[in-house]
Amino acid sequence: YAQLKPEEIAHIPDVDLVLGAEQKLNILDYLDDLHKQKGNGTIITTQSQDIRTFSPSCSRGDRTRYFLKVQDGCDYYCTYCTIPFARGRSRNGSIAELVKQAETVAASGGKEIVLTGVNIGDFGKSTGESFFDLVKVLDRVEGIERYRISSIEPNLLTDEIINYVATSRRFAPHFHIPLQSGSDEVLKLMHRRYDTALFKSKIQKIKSVMPDAFIGVDLIVGVRGETEQFFNDAVRFVYGLDISQLHVFTYSERPNTQ
């Protein structure tokens, strides 16, 4: 919100300071220089395309599992999504940094880590590494009993990742894969980077090596340009998938979506 509509927030009564995505983690630095003034709040932001900072974090809150952020931002610019404008370009921490975070979790008694990010399969753009490299190294951290991979794009879920999870002692056979639509025509409207044939092949690959794997799938309905025929095509496609769970959302039209 602050990255997308800073002026709107600055006009809210009693708002003194609005920080963008790159500045928010250093809020104390800005508070020292903040002076109460009449008028709208002070805005300090960076253009989304210029955001380069990655701040690794690992949180648990009141949960029994930890969430380790390995990547942030997205370069995909799907027509229904504002994340690239709110979170900036794809970037990530180094494998060495993230392994230290996992080791800290293990030392504190944590047993499960969920790997999170905006587009985690795109991991490595900042460091010249790959998500598969990260998976293999984290699998060697003693003390962690289970990892889960959060939502990963089907075109970035490689066979080598699937095969590795199938034989890993620590990576759970648990996948969350955004389909968004089961209609190839709608996928084109969305500017997605795969078609239904590729998506189905990923499901079949997972089930061929992990018959009991859990597979969750995201769907969006009602996007601009989706006809009744396209919707029915999507329903038929989904019925033919061997999956465990559906997350279904209605399209939400917002500024910067198409």
Report each predicted region and the residues it spans.
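Proteins enriched for Cys/Gly/acidic motifs involved in redox and nucleic-acid/cofactor modification
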Residues: 1-122, 175, 197-204, 208, ...
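Generic structural signal for secondary-structure transition and capping sites
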Residues: 36-39, 143, 170, 243
